[in-house]
Regions:
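A charged helix-plus-loop insertion that forms the helical arch/lid used to bind
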Residues: 87-103
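Divalent-metal (Mg2+/Mn2+/Ca2+)-assisted nucleotide/phosphate chemistry catalytic cores
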Residues: 98-110, 114-222
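N- or domain-start disorder-to-order transition segments that initiate the globular core
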Residues: 1-35
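N-terminal catalytic cores of NTP/NDP-binding nucleotidyl/phosphoryl-transfer enzymes
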Residues: 23-87, 194-200, 206
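Buried hydrophobic packing segments
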Residues: 59-66, 179, 203-210, 301, ...
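Short acidic, glycine/serine/threonine-rich loops at helix termini
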Residues: 85-89, 137-143, 231-235
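Conserved nucleotide- and phosphate/pyrophosphate-binding catalytic cores
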Residues: 201, 209-406
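Short, hinge-like loop/turn segments at secondary-structure boundaries
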Residues: 90-95, 144-147, 238-239
Length: 406
């Protein structure tokens, strides 16, 4: 008789149903939970950039639940494969990243992941790098790996098909990438991996290689992906439509308040721990007071990463600043030597190249720049500044001027 699923396993499946898209396969996952063995969960990251957002954290929180049941995360830093570049989701070839940058990104990635995962217990988490095996991998062994998979299978990938339609190049190292990622699963003896659906092709190759090489195939769980805070494309640093784990509590709250009303329920389901029954009741009330429930959502997102004092302070700051129109006291100071400025030059100095001239001009044209509460629409207007003057740019940026000697 098959061993029944215990209460902890049932609760885990119920919790995972909330954030998972697909499980390959559910029966295999249930058997894994019933087995009583410590599950080895592969979490592979190619550290092309050092930031994590709350979409990535969905996977981390699921792994945290598994850790709390005694299972082990193998935190795999793809330092070797990062040098190749994952073509996933790209219509062009990813640039090669220097090793020094990879190491720096990995450190920052781990720092942010520690906000969720248990890193301090070696029985619950182990850090590995795939350069451990690939840097010493022989050409003959690699050719054996290649011989197991067909060109037709690799080229069937949707992003490659899109490039073919556009008559754009596909480089050989990009086709090899999923083979290497798949082989990682075999080396680590992965029982389970939790990924975004965009990584499914690569991890299915992991199952394939495990079968070919005589190992039990890993279970794959893909997680739900929401639009970013702009309500359009998924969260991305390049689009600046994300809530980052590395963002301050203030930024997290402010960015949460940008979420479109129609996404409040989805964000509550996927990025918070509010019970589903309560979310169903909230869904019926949102249209009558969306601002109230958006603040509720912002608080619930913050609770996962910050303490109650921070949550309370950030809501008060937001309400004072944006509802009561009170200029905050703790705004940054820009120190300057001169009193006479062209408006755009002063604003440009504050942003220190993080915004282009065209972006800044557009802000002036939109009436989004003010000097001591007076709107400035002409970017080339000459202004005379003294210490304690306040410049506001957009809805959420202020800075105070301090003139040397004045």
């Amino acid at each position: 008789m098959a061993r029944p699923l215990d209460n902890s396993g049932k609760k885990l499946l119920e919790s995972f149903a909330r954030t998972s898209e697909e499980i390959f396969s559910l029966n295999e996952f249930e058997e894994l939970l019933k087995s009583g063995k410590q599950i080895r969960i592969k979490y592979g990251v190619d550290v092309t950039s050092p930031f994590l957002h709350i979409g990535h954290a969905v996977n981390l929180w699921m792994m945290r639940e598994l850790q709390e049941l005694g299972h082990k995360v193998i935190f795999l830093i793809g330092d070797f494969t990062t040098q190749i570049g994952d073509p996933t989701g790209r219509g062009d070839t990813r640039p090669i990243i220097p090793r020094e940058e990879i190491e720096k990104n990995a450190e920052e990635f781990i720092r942010q992941a520690k906000m969720v995962l248990h890193f301090d217990d070696p029985n619950l988490l182990e850090i590995r790098k795939n350069s451990e095996w690939f840097s010493e991998y022989s050409l003959s062994d690699f050719l054996k790996l290649l011989a197991m998979v067909t060109h037709a299978r690799l080229i069937s990938r949707d992003m490659f098909q899109r490039r073919i339609e556009k008559q754009e190049d596909i480089y050989m190292h990009e086709m090899i990438y999923p083979i290497l990622q798949g082989y990682d699963s075999y080396v680590l003896g992965s029982d389970l991996t939790i990924i975004g659906s965009d990584q499914l092709f690569n991890e299915m190759l992991g199952r394939f290689y495990q079968q070919k090489l005589g190992q039990k195939s890993q279970v794959i769980i893909t997680t739900k992906i929401t639009p970013g805070i702009d309500g359009k494309a998924k969260q991305s640093k390049s689009l600046d439509n994300y809530i980052g784990l590395g963002h301050s509590s203030r930024d997290k709250f402010g960015r949460s308040m940008k979420i479109p009303d129609e996404l409040i329920v989805d964000y509550l389901k996927i990025y918070t721990t509010v019970p589903m029954g309560e979310i169903s009741r909230i869904e019926k009330k949102i249209s009558s007071d969306p601002m109230k429930w958006k603040k509720f959502l912002a608080r619930e997102i913050l609770k996962r990463y910050h303490n109650e004092v921070d949550v309370k302070n950030e809501q008060e700051w937001f309400e004072n600043t944006f509802s009561k129109k009170i200029t905050p006291d703790d705004i940054p100071v820009l120190e300057v030597c001169e009193s006479q400025w062209v408006a755009i030059d002063l604003v440009k100095k504050y942003f220190n190249k993080s915004k282009s001239n065209s972006e800044l001009r557009r802000l002036f044209e939109q009436g989004a720049v003010s000097f001591n509460d007076r709107k400035i629409s002409a970017f080339d207007e000459k202004i005379n500044v003294v210490s304690e003057d306040v410049i506001k740019v957009g809805k959420r940026t202020w800075f105070k001027v301090r003139v040397e000697g004045k």
